[in-house]
Design a protein with these regions (language model features):
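Switch I (G2) and immediately adjacent beta-strands of P-loop GTPase domains
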Residues: 55-67, 71-75, 255-283, 301-304
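Conserved beta-strand segments of alpha/beta enzyme cores
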Residues: 110, 271-273, 357
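C-terminal-of-GTPase-core extension/linker across diverse P-loop GTPases
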Residues: 2-11, 15-18, 144-266, 283, ...
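Glycine-rich, N-terminal phosphate-binding loop of Rossmann-like dinucleotide-binding domains
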Residues: 92, 242, 277, 309-312, ...
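A glycine-rich (often HGG/GG-containing) alpha/beta subdomain
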Residues: 1-148, 152, 156, 332
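Inter-motif core of Ras-like GTPase G domains
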Residues: 288-312
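Generic enzyme active-site microenvironment
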Residues: 274, 308, 334
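Glycine-rich phosphate-binding loop used to anchor ATP phosphates in small-molecule kinases
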Residues: 59, 196, 305-319
């Protein structure tokens, strides 16, 4: 357990040589520590200077200059942690950064744990848990959608919605408990009928947040994309073309890819997590059959399936089997090898695919790939994304808590509809209230908070 009375310090920038490095100090002794090791170019008492001011000078080890620095003084509670905070802008060499940090620790600070600065911001009430998790998402954002979604959550969009629902539930819980304590003066007859539409609206609002979770996950993590097709249709060539490098082995020998290959790439503002699978066909080879079974399993979990067919060969039962497997998923079909003599019946393929879009490609000649990438973007981002109005859940922990809250409300509604006493459905209301509290950290256990903040980088 972290002791908040201790002053903590850490290097806040990447742990490699760079032009500038930053060291952060937070806690009640931050100013006295910097006073001991910093010599301002113009003499002044660093414990008495105004807040949010920058000071030029030198980090000193006794009489020896360690580095020429800028020191930023920020007085709590108007800081990231709500504690007195110092940030030192040093030269970015790891030796000078570690030497400066060593002096700070020698003079009374403790080395911060991963995420401890943000944990203090949470414990001191500056941010809630959903906002703290958004800090990680901002750091890890790999595309513009992920960044905008994380920044929106960091500003408190999720927190605001959750607090609104909790206030509504708390008001109902308080009324019921007061009525149970004082039935002579507080009327409960017919209250269930009054409560039902309120709970229905709460559940609908939670449902709306839950419905955003898949879009939120895709924004944050990328589109889980599985390439399917029978052997030697160009699946590995497609992966290599998208990556711009030979990641997968490409030969004319069917069945070359037996183990799935996984890669992540960003195409403009679209992030794809691509899995190139073994070719699907009827086979007696035990090892190849395992690869085929794995490919079918990957298809079940995919956000997008890219079905690749070979224009130079007639369609066969293997193609038809794959189309049946993928029919209920989001699919883009590629009729590849357009540079060769065409043998596949395009009309038959279109009839089999139905509403599945088909693009004619020659991957080796880079034909059709631009249309393929554009179609992916349209399929997943065609609706206008308004980050001012729409809130996206991007976190599995938050999704789980919201689902539990929704289930508790549904149970309460069912109890009311069946004419159960207030004692029964009040328990469910309190459960829903607690589950919503988990989203923003109002009811979080210490162990869970420790686990969440341990995922942060050092110095954040």
């Amino acid at each position: 357990m972290i002791h908040q009375t201790e002053t903590i310090a850490a290097i806040a920038t990447a742990m490699n040589n760079s032009g500038i490095g930053i060291i952060r100090i937070s806690g009640e002794d931050a100013f006295s520590i910097i006073h001991k090791i910093f010599k301002p170019a113009k003499e002044k008492d660093m414990q008495q200077v105004s807040s949010h001011t920058v000071h030029y000078g030198y980090i000193m080890d006794g009489d020896r200059i360690v580095d020429e620095v800028l020191v930023l003084i920020m007085k709590g509670p108007h800081t990231y942690t709500r504690e007195d905070t110092v940030e030192i802008d040093c030269h970015g060499g790891m030796y000078v950064l570690n030497k400066t940090l060593e002096l700070i620790l020698k003079n009374g600070a403790r080395a911060a744990e991963p995420g401890e600065f943000t944990k203090r911001a949470f414990l001191n009430g500056r941010i809630d848990l959903s906002q703290a998790e958004a800090v990680i998402d901002v750091i890890n954002a790999e595309n513009d959608f992920a960044l905008k979604s994380a920044v929106t959550q960091l500003k408190g969009s999720v927190s605001e919605k959750i607090r609104k629902e909790r206030e509504i539930l708390l008001e109902q819980i308080a009324y019921i408990e007061a009525a149970l304590d004082d039935p002579e003066h507080i009327e409960m007859e017919g209250y269930g009928e009054t409560l039902l539409p309120i709970l229905h609206d709460c559940r609908a609002d939670i449902e709306e947040l839950l419905n955003s979770a898949d879009d939120g996950r895709i924004m944050k993590e990328g589109i889980k994309t599985v390439i399917l097709g029978k052997p030697n249709v160009g699946k590995s060539s497609l992966l290599n073309a998208l990556l711009g490098q030979d990641r997968a082995i490409v030969t004319d020998i069917a069945g070359t890819t037996r183990d799935a290959l996984e890669e992540s790439l960003r195409l403009n503002d679209v992030t794809l997590n691509i899995i190139d699978t073994a070719g699907i066909r009827s086979t007696e080879d035990i090892i190849e059959k395992i690869g085929v079974d794995k490919a079918k399993e990957y298809a079940k979990e995919a956000d997008l399936i890219v079905f690749v067919a070979d224009a130079s060969r007639p369609l066969d039962d293997d193609d038809r089997e794959i189309i049946e497997i993928i029919r209920e998923k989001k699919v883009i079909a590629l009729l590849n090898k357009q540079d060769l003599e065409i043998a596949a019946d395009r009309k038959e393929l279109k009839d089999l695919l139905g509403e599945i879009p088909l693009i004619e490609t020659s991957i080796v000649e880079n034909v059709g790939l631009d249309a393929f990438v554009q179609l992916i973007r349209e399929m997943f981002y065609r609706k206008e994304i308004n980050f001012n109005d729409q809130v996206y859940i991007t976190n599995a922990r938050q999704k789980s808590a919201l689902a539990a809250a929704k289930a508790a409300l549904a149970k309460a509604e069912e109890s009311i509809a069946q004419g159960m006493s207030e004692d029964f459905f009040t328990i469910d209301l309190m459960d829903a209230y607690a589950q919503l509290g988990l989203v923003i950290g109002e009811t979080v256990e210490d162990d869970l908070a420790d686990e969440i903040f341990s995922k942060f980088c050092m110095g954040k």
